[in-house]
Amino acid sequence: MKTKSKVLFGMGVCLMAMACQQNAGQKTTLSGLDPMKFQTEVNGKSTQLFTLKNANGMEVCITNFGGRIVSIMVPDKNGKMEDVVLGFDSIADYINKPSDFGAAIGRYANRIQKGRFVLDGDTVKLPTNNFGHCLHGGPKGWQYQVYEGKQLNDSTVYLTMQSPDGDNQFPGNVTAHVTYTLKSNNSIDIKYDATTDKKTVINMTNHSYFNLSGNPKNAITDNVLYINADSITPVDSTFMTTGEMLSLNGNSMDFRNAKPISEGLDMNNQQIKFGKGIDHNYVLNTKGDINKLAAKLVCPSTGISLEVYTNEPGIQVYTGNFLDGTTTGKHGIVYNQRTAVCMETQHYPDSPNKPQWPSVILAPGQTYQSHCIFKFGVEK
C-alpha cells in the first residue's frame, strides 16, 4: 500500500562498512545480490543479508533492515528461476530511496486517522506522514529500523524488534518477533508475535511487491486475481476508511470469480478514482482460518502462481498505483505504475478508532500473534 507519502526520512543514518572476514569470499545469491552490500551499520546496529533455500532450488533473501524480503527466486512453467519481488541491491539504496518494499511493517500497518486514537481515556498522538494520517507506524516505522537477526538453519530466520515506550509516540515497551521459514512446498511461512508492558495497539504485515513475470518492466494488469471477500472497507479521498462495509456485488473490484486485474480497474468507480487503482482492505470470508485460501494471483506468461493464507480478518490489495518511474530498483530496473501487486494481510485500517471492528489492542500479559503464508506454484 504505497501512496504519494510525504515521508520525512530524518533517520540520522550512520553507514559504516563492515568487511566481515568470515564472509569475505561469499558469492552472490541466485538472484544476483551481493551480500557484502548489505553488511553495514544503521544507527549503530549491524545489518546483513540472510539467504534461505529449500531442496527444490527456491531461494529467499531477507535483510534485518526493516525485516525485508529482498528477493524470492521461484521456478516458472519452464523451470527457469525468476525473482518475483521488487527491491534494491543494497542497504544504501533502501536508505536513500525510502520505500516499503518487502518490509515487516510495525507497529501499526496501514493508516490511523489523523494520527490519533484514544486508549483508556488518554489520547495518543502519533506523527503523521500521509494526507494528515499516520501510515505504517509513521515516518520512522519499523521498516526503517534494524531488527536483530538470527538464522536458525538453512530455511529459517528469526528477527527481533525491541521497540521502546514512545517509539513513534506509541505507548509501551514492545518486543516483537518475525519468523520467516521457507518450506519444502515452496511456501514462505511468516509468523509474527509481540508482547508489551503497557496497553498499546499493534498490527503487523509484510509489504512485498510481487511481479510474478520475473521482470518488473512488465505490467501486472494481465495477472489473474482471486480474492475470497464479499466486501471492502471503503475509503475517502485521503485513503482513510469511512467505517463502513461496502458490498462487492456488482462492483468492478469483486474478484470472487478470478479475472485479470485490468478488469477490476474501472476508473468510473469512485473507489478506484480515489486510489488511482486498487488500494483497499478486503474483508476476508476465511474467518481467521489459516487453511482457507484468502487470495490467489497467477501470471499467464510464466505460469507462476501465488496463494495467500492468513489468520487475519483482512488483506490490503494494492496494484502499484503510485509507482511512477522515479525509482530504480534491483539490477537497474525502473519501477513504473502497475508493475507490482501487494497482498498485505492485516487487521482493518484505523481499527483503533473503529470499535465496531476486530480489536488491535494488546495488553500486558497478552501475546499478539499473526500468521501469513505465501505459497508459490506453477500453472501450465
State the predicted function of each range.
Residues 21-58, 64-380:
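An exposed, glycine/acidic-rich loop-and-rim segment of catalytic or binding clefts
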Residues 17-19:
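C-terminal motif of bacterial Sec signal peptides marking the signal peptidase cleavage site
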